[in-house]
Amino acid sequence: PYFSFKKYQVEDGLSHNTVWCALQDSYGFIWLGTSDGLNRYDGRGNKVYRNVLNEKFSLENNFVEALIEVDKNLWVGTNSGLYIYDRDTDRFSYFDKTTQYNVYISSEIKKIIKTENGLIWIATLGQGFFIYDPKTEVLTQNSVQTSFVWDLCQSADRKRVYISSLQEGLLCFDENGKFLRTYEISLDINASDSYKVNCIQNIDGDIWIGAGSNLLSRLDERTEAID
């Protein structure tokens, strides 16, 4: 197959050349989270969303690292909390739900996913991960195993969630958030970054793991072996 690529950068209207996340929504718009604003590209032009002084319905933080579409609306993860974009009003609202212990999401958000059972998982640097149930509107926090979560990934059968940690390596939970096990990624105890799992991706049923500065591993879910 033939692929054609076009570079899109600040000179073309992009708010910043550092792009952290990208999403094509159900309406065909391409959303790009950057270090200086959220961009919406429609194929012809680009609209930039940033913080507007004294405007309560704008983003309060321009550093956007995570995006997901939930019920036609956009969930926007920044480095100081979560915002919901309402498509009908073209406005943002701060996600102010709290846990039963009155904890709200205030840390840098690295990844947001929605699991098969409808739960929304939110990975943060500093507060572990949160799980939000849209049906009950209940928010729970898990920071027992690790406080610094870099990435989230579902298993091939959608029954488990893998979490990459900057402290403990690769962690596995069931779809409801129950801790199952830890996977040891590197045996090189002399490497200062040997357990820092940076990213995980499900490709054709295998979990690919990027760890440290130069390590790529593969988890076979059937045998639970890492090579």
Predicted regions and their residues:
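Carboxylate-rich, polar loop motifs that coordinate divalent cations or form catalytic acidic clusters
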Residues: 1-227
